[in-house]
Amino acid sequence: DVYKRQFVGIVGLIDPPRDEAITAIADCRTAGITVKMITGDHKDTAAAIARQLHLADDPKAMTGAELDEVAEADLPSVARSVSVFARTNPEHKLRIVRALQSNGQVVAMTGDGVNDAPSLKQADVGVAMGRKGTEAAKEAAEMVLANDDFASIVAAVREGRTVYDNIR
């Protein structure tokens, strides 16, 4: 009987962002690189993680359902101003990448699943995860991260900029 049950307790778990991720985001921001989070997580959870990562000074979050209500003409400015896109599907990811590109931005997109393949292919630089990534994601991407570490992208950009500066 439901009424004779006794509540014993509750457990909460958290997987906090790694220090390396926080440092990598800070390095991106210092280098003028804007990082967006596109996730299937709940909006409040994603926004809390974005704040822990210092993704933006005041990270704005939007759900895929809210994104569906945005007119195509308004999407580029929304994509520019929103830091976190939560509860998204593959079509949302693709719309976000295209909207950022329409702003003249060079877009690097990371992903590991079959559902990421269309946006990895659309991005200027698709980056798949080498360890946990699916074959579909790896085939759609231009680059595969052998160690699945976001900080590797930051290091690659830094190295590329150094080479570019030395050539000039």
Regions found by a protein language model. Name each.
Residues 1-99, 103, 117, 131, ...:
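Cytosolic catalytic headpieces and adjacent flexible linkers of membrane translocases
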Residues 34, 106, 125:
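Residues at the starts of beta-strands that form the adenosine-phosphate
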Residues 47, 108, 153-154:
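Short helix/loop capping segments that flank catalytic or ligand/cofactor-binding pockets
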Residues 73-76, 101, 121-125, 131-168:
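Non-transmembrane, extramembrane segments of multi-pass ion/lipid transporters
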